[in-house]
């Protein structure tokens, strides 16, 4: 059996899709379906069982067995960069992750988990997986950073696989439940389908991020599991492309050409990553050599999926 925490969420459900594509269906999904709309991410997938995240944690801490587990993909977390309840964030993203990690170590189960590029904070260069480059801007980024630091202490002595992925700006299918935290591509598509003029922040040609397609993210997760590599790795494309490029790709799909530029919100100033670009040196050195979709390629594929579903 494979366990995917956050399996009804964005990246988790895409990992399940990738597993299904390999004929793997003996999957336990762990999540919180209080937001019932997330069920839609699972309806076309094949899984063996579902468990609430709190029930899973209770069983885990009690040392209960779940049968033979081949791997745990730990994608479950609060991923809102605008959430400032630090206790909630640390309980969800730090303490919970420690419990799952120690269960995996005790049972020698491969543990693959979601870290984040938010660990780097507001820097504009050298996005490198090393302490001197890490200074998160928000409590979400801090929760991810602190767990990475915890993992670094354990990695040298670990007898089973531990691998963390610092996701950059992931976009693609199955993110609709995220609301305001969904990607710019998702929001532009919604606006275009509603007959609105799509909106971007002023200066969006200068805001550049490493936009990575979720199908590529799932592929990297599976490759590392299959190859047993441990460590903490950036997971982006290695390219920084502008929000304007995302909009251009969405407009091209919809055969439109007009955009409205709106003022940048005061509340985001100083708490916003204006530039991200993954350094893929360590990822490539680990042996992952497949290409990543460009914004033009990924957004076109995503637009086709959104307007088919």
Swiss-Prot record:
One of its GO terms (biological process) is carbohydrate metabolic process. Its EC number is 5.1.3.20. Pfam families: Epimerase (PF01370). GO terms for molecular function: ADP-glyceromanno-heptose 6-epimerase activity; NADP binding. Catalyzes the interconversion between ADP-D-glycero-beta-D-manno-heptose and ADP-L-glycero-beta-D-manno-heptose via an epimerization at carbon 6 of the heptose. This is ADP-L-glycero-D-manno-heptose-6-epimerase. Binds 1 NADP(+) per subunit.
């Amino acid at each position: 059996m494979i366990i995917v925490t956050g399996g009804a969420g964005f990246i988790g459900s895409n990992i399940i899709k990738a597993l299904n594509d390999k004929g793997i269906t003996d999957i336990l999904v762990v999540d919180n379906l209080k937001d019932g709309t997330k069920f839609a991410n699972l309806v076309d997938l094949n899984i063996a069982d579902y468990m609430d995240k709190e029930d899973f944690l209770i069983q885990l801490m009690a040392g209960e067995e779940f049968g033979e587990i081949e791997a745990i993909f730990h994608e479950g977390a609060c991923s809102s960069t605008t959430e400032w309840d630090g206790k909630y964030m640390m309980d969800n993203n730090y303490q919970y992750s420690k419990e799952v990690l120690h269960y995996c170590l005790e049972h020698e189960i491969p543990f693959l988990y979601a870290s984040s590029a938010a660990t780097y904070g507001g820097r504009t260069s050298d996005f490198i997986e090393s302490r001197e480059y890490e200074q998160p801007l928000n409590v979400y980024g801090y929760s991810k950073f602190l767990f990475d630091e915890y993992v670094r202490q354990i990695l040298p002595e670990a007898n089973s696989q531990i691998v963390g992925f610092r996701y950059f700006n992931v976009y693609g299918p199955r993110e609709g439940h995220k609301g305001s935290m969904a990607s710019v591509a998702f929001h532009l598509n919604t606006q275009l389908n509603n007959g609105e003029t799509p909106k971007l922040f002023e200066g969006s040609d200068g805001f550049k991020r490493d936009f990575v397609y979720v199908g590529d993210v799932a592929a990297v997760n599976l490759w590392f599991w299959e190859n047993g590599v441990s460590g903490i790795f950036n997971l982006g494309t290695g390219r920084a492309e502008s929000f304007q490029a995302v909009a251009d790709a969405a407009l091209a799909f919809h055969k439109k050409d007009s955009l409205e530029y709106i003022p940048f919100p005061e509340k985001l100033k100083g708490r916003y990553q204006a530039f991200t670009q993954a350094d893929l040196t360590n990822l490539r050195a680990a042996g992952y050599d497949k290409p990543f979709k460009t914004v033009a390629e990924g957004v076109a594929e995503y637009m086709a999926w959104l307007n088919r579903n």
